[in-house]
């Protein structure tokens, strides 16, 4: 696949900033573009097999995701497969921390191409998300548990759905899940619970 990068800037020791990123899918269609991707990494946890990102930003995201039908893979599947371990005989445990993930000015399109879209009707087979803005803290993600705080997610969908703010905290393991401080705000309604 083709990947192009406009500019790479290495900050103090552990920060990387990449401007004007574009990746095509295997058919040559635009798959992922971003005006800026930035991350600040913590190297000390790597010695213990942990991945720690103190902050990450994704600005001007434009993602075009599709699949031909319900049974075919998404056009991004080859990227996910390339990230998977080639050694299937042993398992490397996942241990990930992201102190702060900020997404601004994002757009995500998802389409299942064998189903015709209905204008003005929300459909999980045809998402047209714009004005995506998010602030997420991934306290801890392992094979066994997750500790996640969604400070804010806001977006608009082409169907007319407008999510002004979604926030919650999630703590889950293999036995139970606890959802706290949940709040969702739409243009004319709001729901929240502790």
PLM features: residue spans?
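Extracellular/lumenal and peripheral-membrane lipid-interaction modules
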Residues: 1-4
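Amphipathic hydrophobic-ligand
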Residues: 27-41, 115-133, 160-168, 183-194
């Amino acid at each position: 696949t083709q990947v192009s990068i406009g500019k790479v800037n290495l900050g103090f020791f552990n920060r990387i900033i990449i401007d004007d990123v574009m990746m095509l899918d295997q058919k040559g269609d635009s798959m992922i573009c971003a005006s800026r991707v930035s991350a600040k990494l913590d190297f000390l946890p790597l010695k213990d097999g942990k991945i720690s990102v103190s902050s990450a930003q994704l600005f001007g995201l434009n993602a075009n995701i599709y699949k031909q039908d319900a049974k075919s893979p998404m056009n991004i599947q080859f990227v996910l497969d390339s990230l998977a371990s080639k050694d299937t005989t042993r398992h490397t445990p996942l241990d990930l921390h992201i102190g702060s993930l900020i997404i601004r000015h994002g757009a995500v399109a998802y389409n299942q191409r064998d189903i015709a879209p209905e204008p003005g009707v929300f459909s999980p087979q045809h998402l047209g998300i714009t004005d995506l803005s998010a602030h997420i803290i991934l306290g801890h993600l392992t094979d066994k548990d997750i500790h996640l705080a969604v400070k804010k997610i806001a977006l608009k969908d082409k169907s007319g759905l407008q999510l002004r703010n979604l926030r919650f905290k999630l703590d889950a393991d293999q036995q139970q899940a606890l959802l706290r401080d949940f709040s969702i705000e739409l243009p004319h309604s709001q729901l929240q619970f502790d």
